[in-house]
Amino acid sequence: MARPKNVKHIFVTGGVISSLGKGILSASLGMLLKSRGLKVAIQKYDPYINVDPGTMSPYQHGEVYVTDDGAETDLDLGHYERFLDEATSQASNLTMGRVYKSVIDKERSGEYLGGTVQVVPHVIDEIKDRMAELAKNGNLDVLITEIGGTIGDIESLPFLEAMRQMKLEMGERNLLNIHLTFVPYIKAACELKTKPTQHSVKMLLETGIQPDILVCRSEKPLSREIKNKVGHFCNVNELDVIGLNDCDTIYEVPLMLLKEKLDLRVMKKLGLKKFREPNLEYWRDFCNKVLHPTEGEVTIGVCGKYTEYPDAYKSILEAFIHAGASNNVRVTIKLLRAEDAEAGSFDFKKEMQGVSGVLVAPGFGDRGIEGKISFIRYAREQNIPFFGICLGMQCATIEFARNVCGLHDANSTEFNKRTRFPVIDLMEQQKKVKEKGGTMRLGSYPCIIKEGSKAYDIYKKFLINERHRHRFEFNNTYRSALEEQGMVFSGTSPNGELVEIIELKDHRWFVGVQFHPELKSRVQQVHPLFHGFVAAAKEYEKGSRQMELTVDMPSFMPVENEPAQ
């Protein structure tokens, strides 16, 4: 595949340790370049052999981020969208598994004309062709590619070799490498240590790549002497050693990099003309609202199955930051482990003291389901603002059917195939699907909102498009029974068959959605559902918290279903 001309490439690599923030660095740099008038896109290359992260455990991978076109991708794409305010796509995330699968498929179909298929050139050429895929669409000025993993990992070597070859082919004015490293602060010596960075650069040099710019993560700011030392030992100009010390919120990172002039150094090295001066007043204002809210604090209880690993709910947590800023309050998250409410000893009155809203998060499988249902019942009966997302909406339906409509065995066929009242059931088009990977209802779908509903008050329009990731849906057989008891089906697919939004008539704020609104919340455009939920929690905190909670939650009594796993 011919590579598009005039597109400048920036590759972001990482060294010393993982989780330094390559995704935040890539997103921040992209935002700065966009603010100067350049057209920017970002993509993530992951070295694992999975074709995509769709079947990976949240404990290993964290959140699976779904794009409009239905790709199941790395959570870093969420950062790209939130910082750039640009949609990503299937082409924005490539795994080594997808590369190998493509090469093997081509070999099986005879595309290599009987040749011996090898890492060099076939796998490397496949990577380079994929790198050009995003560049050829969208009339780009700059394409930023984040390479996952840490320098020294054997899995990342093909990506690094592809980058090395591309730099040789394209020239230094068209491709540069930004290497993110770690400069630890040793408290006993009161000193920043540069040796790990030196060794990381040495390992990068062994692959044939000389970094053009070093970004050094550290606990404390880097002095000029430290920058000079790093530059001297790593063969990098002192001006190209960028300090990035710890900050209170990731949204401060673009402002820190602007102060360090990273964007100007990148533009100079790539021969980009000096575009307009960036106007980041809106970003500074957002950071100020995040760090210094003027209207108090609300606590939101987030009930989930993977609360030991908050990255499983990354977009939800970020959406609450956006909604907090838009409501001028600090949102404190209290993670609620669903299984705790199944043990029979969970003290709702004590543990939920001070909680002004309950969100039941997405997930899969029957572990913790009865606990989620208990939290939903508590929020419904205590009139606490409630928000259910995907599985959270399905659990809210089950709880309402059991405890309000008298369908005591109500359940989802995902958890109990023999339930007498399958209020949640497998979608018809999913019943013949055998494979797991990439086969759910994925991506953006339209939803029609009912006039006069809370959902309409929130969105203020009839037609919306939201992203989905599910196999199960509300069973329309039970729609009338639930409507008679006060449930409102306020959002459906255009043909009216698939329930997208539920709410309760006689509750201050009780909304469940089949889709994932957290995936579309951004700094400049907070998602209306999160804004509305936090606003309701803020109102609850101000007023209803003064009232005594008079109804005690009964001890947890599991429904006679299949044993929980």
Swiss-Prot record:
Active site: 390 (nucleophile), 516, 518
PROSITE patterns membership: GATASE_TYPE_1
Residues reported to bind ATP: 19-24, 76
GO terms assigned for molecular function: ATP binding; CTP synthase activity; glutaminase activity; identical protein binding; metal ion binding
Catalysed reaction, written as an equation: UTP + L-glutamine + ATP + H2O = CTP + L-glutamate + ADP + phosphate + 2 H(+); L-glutamine + H2O = L-glutamate + NH4(+); UTP + NH4(+) + ATP = CTP + ADP + phosphate + 2 H(+)
Enzyme Commission number, as recorded: 6.3.4.2
Additional remark text: CTPSs have evolved a hybrid strategy for distinguishing between UTP and CTP. The overlapping regions of the product feedback inhibitory and substrate sites recognize a common feature in both compounds, the triphosphate moiety. To differentiate isosteric substrate and product pyrimidine rings, an additional pocket far from the expected kinase/ligase catalytic site, specifically recognizes the cytosine and ribose portions of the product inhibitor.
Keywords: ATP-binding, Glutamine amidotransferase, Ligase, Magnesium, Metal-binding, Nucleotide-binding, Pyrimidine biosynthesis
Gene name for this UniProt entry: pyrG
Sequence ranges assigned to domain Glutamine amidotransferase type-1 in this UniProt record: 299-543
Name of the molecule in the record: CTP synthase
Chain positions recorded as L-glutamine binding sites: 59, 363, 391-394, 414, 471
Annotated CDD domains: CTPS_N, GATase1_CTP_Synthase
Domain of life: Bacteria
InterPro entries reported for this sequence: Class_I_gatase-like, CTP_synthase, CTP_synthase_N, GATASE, GATase1_CTP_Synthase, P-loop_NTPase
Annotated binding of CTP, by residue: 18, 153-155, 193-198, 229
